[in-house]
C-alpha cells in the first residue's frame, strides 16, 4: 500500500502534560475549594527495489532524493531487519544495568555505557550536564484495618506504589478513613469537610476498550490528570493522603507509578497509585460503610543530582554543522527495568548510528544521537539541551524521538508544516516494505524534542501499535521479555531510514 496521510490521533507526552496542567488549573477553581500485532510484509529484494518504488509512488517525483539515495534507504531498512544490535543493547541495559531512575547509580552507569558504545562506532561523543531530581522510593505498604463485615482480627493487603516525587508518611504510617470518588466533579459535590483528615481515592478507570482500538494515548490522557493533580486537589480538600487508581491496563494486580505534582500553596501529602483490583475493592467496601486504611510510604527526596544527556554525532560530509536528532530517553522508572519505556527508544536510535557505520553510509549532514536524561521526572535533560543549544535551532534540520514502546510501527508522525506529508512520501514508499508507510500529522511528536518542535524544527516519531503498551507502562512488568525482536528491528528501520533521509536529502525538510 502506498503512503497514506491522516491526522494523528495519539496524544503525545507533551500533549498529555498540557492536558494535565489544564486539568490542574481547572481543579484549583472547583467550587468546593473556594468554599496482538499486525504482521509486516517481507521487504522486497534489492534487485527490484527501484522499479517497485516507482510503481508505489505512482510516478510521483522523488523530489528530495535521487534513485541512489532511495536505494540506500532500502539497504538500511533491510539491514535493520536482521541486525541484532538493538536487541543486544537492550538486553544489556535491562539485565546488566537495570532500572535507571534519574539521579541513581544505575542511571550514571547507563550514561557511561551508552557513551562507550557510541564511541566504539566512531561517533563524536559529548556528555552534556543537567541537574536532575534524585528521589528514592523506599518502603510502600498498605492494609485495610477496618471495613464492613470484617472477620475479627484480620487485615487485608492493599497493593500500591508511591507516585514519583511523593512525600513520606510519618514513620509509623497514617491510619485514616477512605473516601472514594471517581472524578473531580464528585469530589466537588461532597459536603464541606467530607474529606478532611481522611485518605482520598480518585477511582478514574483507564478506558481499556479505547486502548484496544489502538488509542492507548487517549485512554492514558483521560486518567493521568488525577495522578498529576490529585495531591494538590486532595490536600486543598483537607485529605491527609491521596490514592489514585493506576493509569494503565494491567490486570494482574500490578500498580502503575508515574510523576505527580505539588504546590507550595497547599500541604504536600503522601501520594500512591493502587491497582485497579484494589481500587474496585475499596469502592465496593466504602459503599457499605466506613473503611479505614493504614498507609506507610518512606520515599526520600535528595538535592538535585548531576547527570548527563549522551550526545553522539556522526559527522556530515558536506554540512556537519546541520544536525538531525535521533533519540530516546535513557532514564526509566524503578519498578521494572525500563525496557519499553524507554530503553527501546534509546536502542533503536543507537541502531540508526550503528547501521550507518556498518553500511559505510555517510550523509551530508550530521546525524546526532541523543539519550535524554530525566524525561520521567520533568524532562530536565531536554530543558537543558534547549538552553545549551538555544541559538542553534536553525541548524537543527529535523528531530526524531521514539517513546511509545517497541510494538509494530505503522508509519511516521510529523509535526510542522503541512507540506511535510507530501515531502515524506518517497520515504514512506521505502517503509511500505515493513508495513510502516502511513504518514500522520500531529501537533507534537515527543516530550524531549517538544522544545525543538516549538522553535519550528520539523519533528517526527514512529507511529506505533499502542494497544498493549499501557499494560506494562510504569509497572514492574516493563521488562525485556515484553519486546518482540522483529518489531524492535522494524522500529529501528523507521528511525534509521528517516534519519538518513533527513540528513542526506537534496533539499531540507520544509519548515
Task: Provide a role label for each language-model segment.
Residues 19-31:
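Bacterial N-terminal signal peptides
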Residues 45-69, 91, 95-212:
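Noncatalytic luminal/extracellular "stalk/propeptide" segments of secretory-pathway proteins
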Residues 63-104, 254-259, 331, 403-407, ...:
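N-terminal capping segment at the start of a domain
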Residues 72, 147, 159-192, 260-339, ...:
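Soluble metallo-hydrolase cores and metallopeptidase-like ectodomains found primarily
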Residues 73-80, 95-105, 180, 213-231, ...:
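Second-shell loop/turn segments in exported
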Residues 81, 119, 171, 176, ...:
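Metal-dependent peptidase/peptidase-like ectodomains
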Residues 88, 354-380:
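Short helix-loop-beta-strand segments that form the rim/entrance of peptidase-like active sites
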Residues 354, 358, 470-511:
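His/Asp/Glu-rich mid-to-C-terminal helical/loop segments that flank catalytic regions of hydrolases
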